[in-house]
Amino acid sequence: GGKIVSVCTDGHRLAKYVSNISCNDDLSIIIPRKAILEINRILTYFSSNSDILISYSYNNKNFIIQINDFRIISKLIEGNYPDFNKVIPESTSAEITVDKKTFKTSLNIISKVVNQQYKGVKLTPQKDTMHLISSNTDTEIGEDQIDVKYDGEDISIGFNISYLQDVIEVIDGDSIHICINDQNSGCLLKGNNDPNSVFVIMPM
């Protein structure tokens, strides 16, 4: 038994996924973004139950992934990965629970008028509802109000709308838990049917 902890970050957001696997070694490697995109593209051609073998060459600093009879070899990035655990909140003081489909629709509507340079959307949750608002340089305003469950103090917090939309596209479950502390701390997002995935987005 064993596991793979996969993490990626760009400084503004972070995604972490834990996979239960069979492995015989402990190691930490950094794979280039280009290689990850290529692997992801190729995986779409294989069924979900295809055998995947992952290996690592210490001498050549190569990462090798084999899917059935198909093999990908990539050079690795040398160095140490940032301590991502410092970015993931250990605890949060409030939580918004929102229907994923409703949240996605609301963000898509508001994105039509969002400022294309800053792409900011402000979320203001209350006990049973959440107000979303965005504007652009043409003084156009997009706003919506959706049903949520919220158990925290009054707060308004801004995010890059594209980051929220990206998470919604990949998170598993019918509802999303948005866990927050304050307006300046990273926000934790989890799907109700996705215990192995964690997403963190920094507020604007």
Language model features with spans:
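DNA polymerase processivity clamps
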Residues: 1-18, 22-77, 92-204
